Regions:
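Short, electropositive alpha-helical surface patch
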Residues: 107-113, 180, 250-260
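Active-site metal-binding motif and surrounding structural segment of the metallo-beta-lactamase
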Residues: 67-123
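Short hydrophobic/aromatic-enriched beta-strand-loop microsegments
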Residues: 120-125, 196-198
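Hydrophobic/aromatic beta-strand patches that form the interior of the parallel beta-sheet core
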Residues: 11-13, 101, 122, 155, ...
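Metallo-beta-lactamase
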Residues: 1-96, 124-175, 179-241, ...
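Acidic, His/Gly-rich catalytic cores of divalent-metal-dependent hydrolytic chemistry
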Residues: 7, 17-21, 204-210, 255-260
Length: 260
């Protein structure tokens, strides 16, 4: 498929790091007992003079805790910058974010939802039902981080979704990590097409090896989603940005710089 519309800018926001003592939770049977550090990002998109935020990062209140905090799945979250301060540096107020979408509802992706209660929230029906169902803890979700979104303007979707109707920003349904997990396909004027992975894999090697984390909700869906993204990369000539791949993350410009 081919789409001509392009976004104006993509800002990569630093959402801290995540640390685990046993990397095999992301690759069962491999790297057992080895520590692992993962990058965490949120992404600010400028399109048609409007602002969209993809994920909200690890909660800003960790800025006062240099040792971080174990939040879920035994993962320790640490931040060195707040999302709010990075938006301020760009010159954007939280209330100016018109559209909010989340790859999924784990803590490092929903930590600052409270800042964006004026935005229209786009969410897969399957993810919404897991987030607000009887047992969010079964999915590793923390409702205190995102519960306020119930009062946002809501756009419930099922499957792929063209956010602006012009092909520039397309939500790709990639379930398995969570029931309604999504990735994002962007078209940039200079960089070209980019897929923001969400958590379909936590580094490039795990993507290539089709490693399925032990806490994913559906292993078969997880592999199918990785296969689908690989096919999408080939069809679109797109580059994969693996959110938690700390080596790749070090090569990307971060806010206030941007990709165009």
């Amino acid at each position: 498929m081919s789409h001509d519309a392009t976004i104006e800018r993509l800002y990569v926001l630093d959402a801290g790091i995540a640390q685990v003592d046993d990397a095999s939770i992301y690759s069962p049977g491999f790297n057992v007992g080895k520590p692992m550090t993962l990058s965490c990002n949120a992404y600010l998109i400028r399109h048609r003079g409007q602002w969209m935020l993809w994920d909200t990062g690890t909660q800003d209140d960790l800025i006062g805790e240099p040792e971080g905090r174990i939040i879920a799945h035994g993962i320790r979250g640490t931040i060195s910058k707040t999302i709010a301060s990075q938006l301020q540096e760009i010159g954007v107020e939280p209330d100016e974010i018109g559209t909010l979408a989340l790859s999924h509802a784990h803590y490092d992706h929903v930590g600052n939802c409270r800042l964006f209660t004026k935005a229209e929230w786009i969410v897969q029906t399957a993810e919404y039902e897991a987030m607000f169902g009887p047992d969010p803890d079964a999915f590793g979700f923390r409702p205190e981080l995102y519960g306020m979104l119930r009062n946002n303007r809501l756009r419930l979707i099922e499957g792929d979704h063209d956010v602006y109707g012009d092909g520039a920003v397309r939500i790709i349904f990639t379930p398995g990590h969570t029931p309604g997990h999504c990735s994002l396909l962007l078209n940039l004027p200079e960089t070209g097409r980019v897929v923001l992975s969400g958590d379909i894999a936590h580094n490039r090697r795990n993507f290539q090896c089709r490693c399925v984390p032990s806490f994913n909700v559906d292993a078969q869906q997880s592999i199918a989603s990785m296969n689908r993204v690989e096919e999408l990369l080939a069809a679109e000539g797109a580059t994969l940005f693996v959110n938690h791949d700390i080596a790749q993350n070090a090569t990307l410009p971060h806010a206030p710089d941007w990709l165009s």
